[in-house]
Amino acid sequence: MRALALDIGLKRIGVALCVDKKIALPLDAVLRKNRNQAANEIKNLLKIHEISLLIVGIPKGGSSEEEMTRRIKHFVSLLEFDKEICFVDESGTSKKALEYGIANTRKKDGKLDSLAAFIMIKDYFCSLE
């Protein structure tokens, strides 16, 4: 089974890949110019990696939770992904990613976002054990 996790933001989309529920790694983030361009890039990743499960982070709590959830679900609908989609709580994943100390927070290159997606996918499969 191959899974892809997405940490969807307004400017960047963090991406992580998991193979056989064991090997996970962050991929390069998708920098959003517009939603169609970003959706096409994600569609390409879904196809190239033969993804059967899409894990998508949803923010829980906070003042903009409802609006961000609506935007994220709309973006996911643009992917036209016909396999399993699992929405998970992404709360605290960016903070955990910062604790890894790998991503430079001053750069807006998406490494932090992809580390957050990596944490989501790792936590998802750990919760199934």
Curated annotation (Swiss-Prot):
Compartment(s) of residence: Cytoplasm
EC annotation from Swiss-Prot or TrEMBL: 3.1.-.-
PANTHER family: POLYNUCLEOTIDYL TRANSFERASE, RIBONUCLEASE H-LIKE SUPERFAMILY PROTEIN
GO molecular function: nuclease activity
Domain of life from the UniProt record: Bacteria
One BP annotation, GO: rRNA 5'-end processing
Signal peptide range in chain numbering: none
Pfam families registered for this protein in UniProt: RuvX (PF03652)
GO cellular component: cytosol
Taxonomic classification: Bacteria, Pseudomonadati, Campylobacterota, Epsilonproteobacteria, Campylobacterales
Keywords: Cytoplasm, Hydrolase, Nuclease, Ribosome biogenesis
UniProt protein name: Putative pre-16S rRNA nuclease
Family of this protein: Belongs to the YqgF nuclease family.
Predominant place of localization: cytoplasm
HAMAP family (alphabetical): Nuclease_YqgF
NCBIfam families associated with the record: PRK00109.2-2 (NF001026), RNAse_H_YqgF (TIGR00250)
